[in-house]
From Swiss-Prot:
Origin: domain of life: Eukaryota
One Pfam family per UniProt: Arrestin_N
One GO term (biological process): signal transduction
Entry function: Directly interacts with light-activated rhodopsin thereby activating the phosphorylation of metarhodopsin. Inhibits the dephosphorylation of metarhodopsin.
Molecular function as annotated in GO: G protein-coupled receptor binding
Name of the featured protein: Phosrestin-1
């Protein structure tokens, strides 16, 4: 069986410089982060003694673009890495197997490069916009770009520059915690004896995207009130650290009267199942995603993970967390009883059964989507499959080069 290597490519508008990347997603393993490794192919006749530079940049947008007035900006762009690719500054650079294949296939005009993310760099997150909002979405985005210039500080002309948006993501740790998240609350009532107790227990601490979240609810009614109905939510909590803003959105919910009313002296034990999905929140403003909703493999943003000994308060960028919220309606005079149980929503780790199942599903979808796609072709000599990045070109691009 011959295994093909998928490689993503994108060229400048004038076609003189082309990026090749072996992947679009780069994983933070906590003790190290996958390097950004690829190859740049340049037409030597186009350079005319100029140089090719490449950058790894992050753009952190924490406010709406339409609110930027009087020179006030609600975004920060940081250049994380910058390197001269042509002529190559480091001729002894160690290449990955994919880079070796590409250089062998593409010839002497192919130049490898490798960038490294700084430690503790935030994960890619995009906050979903409203339907009529045409500005850039809030979130953290990583871009790798290459351009032709006499020096690295020269103006970057759009005609001779190519940029690609990549994602930095986190996977679930290889070992799961043994503790089952739980919460116990009780409520008494004025001018009435007794209490209603609510206990919620989850069957695990870490859930994977696309999986069921199981919450077992135990209700003991030792009061004179009755529970009318039960509401179950999965809440996504978002913190934008730059402006210290926090908000919460439900990403899955259900309401039921099954087993209700729970009358005085009665008990109820029931397990509820919810599946938080990005596809069920397409039109909801402010939902945090790990990319743009138009992407075929987009998920809800994963929970923010930090190294042992640190708290999420030390994290930068956009901090994401999740919880299961249970509400009991005790009538007009009784009010509500509410409790939250936190959990983590993450990508399955490589090599896990869940990850293999997820990869198999994505591969099937990819095969179907690319059967009739012109931007997809295979080179049998080196078992390389090339796929074009979506071309996002500005209509008023600078034509100077």
């Amino acid at each position: 069986m011959v295994v093909s290597v998928k490689v993503f490519k994108k060229a400048t508008p004038n076609g003189k410089v082309t990026f090749y990347l072996g992947r679009r997603h780069f994983i933070d393993h906590f003790d190290y982060i996958d390097p950004v490794d690829g190859v740049i192919v340049v037409d030597p006749d186009y350079l005319k003694n100029r140089k090719v530079f490449a950058q790894l940049a992050t753009i952190y947008r924490y406010g709406r673009e339409e609110d930027e007035v009087m020179g006030v900006k609600f975004s920060k762009e940081l250049i994380l890495c910058r390197e001269q690719i042509v002529p190559m500054g480091n001729s002894n650079m160690e290449m990955t197997p994919t880079q070796e294949k590409l250089v062998r296939k593409l010839g002497s005009n192919a130049h490898p490069f490798t960038f490294h993310f700084p430690p503790n760099s935030p994960s890619s997150v995009t906050l979903q916009q409203e339907g009529d909002d045409l500005g850039k979405p809030l979130g953290v985005e990583y871009t790798i770009r290459a351009y032709v210039a006499d020096s690295e500080d020269d103006r970057q002309h759009k005609r001779s520059m190519v940029s690609l948006v990549i994602k930095k993501l986190q996977y679930a740790p290889p070992t799961r915690g043994q503790r089952l998240p739980s919460s116990l609350v009780s409520k008494g009532f004025t001018f009435s004896n007794g209490k209603i107790s609510l206990e919620v227990t989850l069957d695990r601490e870490i859930y994977y995207h696309g999986g069921k979240v199981a919450a077992t609810v135990q209700i003991n009614n030792n009061s004179k009130k009755a529970v009318k109905n039960i509401k179950v939510f999965i809440i996504q909590h978002t913190e934008i650290t730059m402006v210290n803003a926090q908000f919460s959105k439900h990403v899955a919910q259900l309401e039921t009267k099954e087993g209700c009313p729970i009358t005085p002296g009665a008990n109820l034990s029931k397990t509820f199942y919810l599946i938080p999905l990005a596809s069920n929140n397409k039109d909801r403003h402010g939902i945090a995603l790990d990319g743009h909703l138009k992407d075929e493999d987009v998920n809800l943003a994963s929970s923010t993970m930090v190294q042992d000994g640190k708290s999420t308060g030390d994290a930068c960028g956009i901090v994401i967390s999740y919880s299961v919220r249970i509400k009991l309606n005790c009538g007009t005079l009784g009010g509500e009883i509410q409790t939250d149980v936190p959990f983590k929503l993450l990508q399955p780790a490589p090599g896990s059964v869940e990850k293999k199942r997820s990869n198999a599903m994505k591969k099937m979808k990819s095969i179907e989507q690319h059967r009739n796609t012109k931007g997809y072709y295979q080179d049998d000599d080196d078992n390389i499959v090339f796929e074009d990045f979506a071309k996002m070109r500005n209509n008023n691009a600078d034509v100077m080069d």
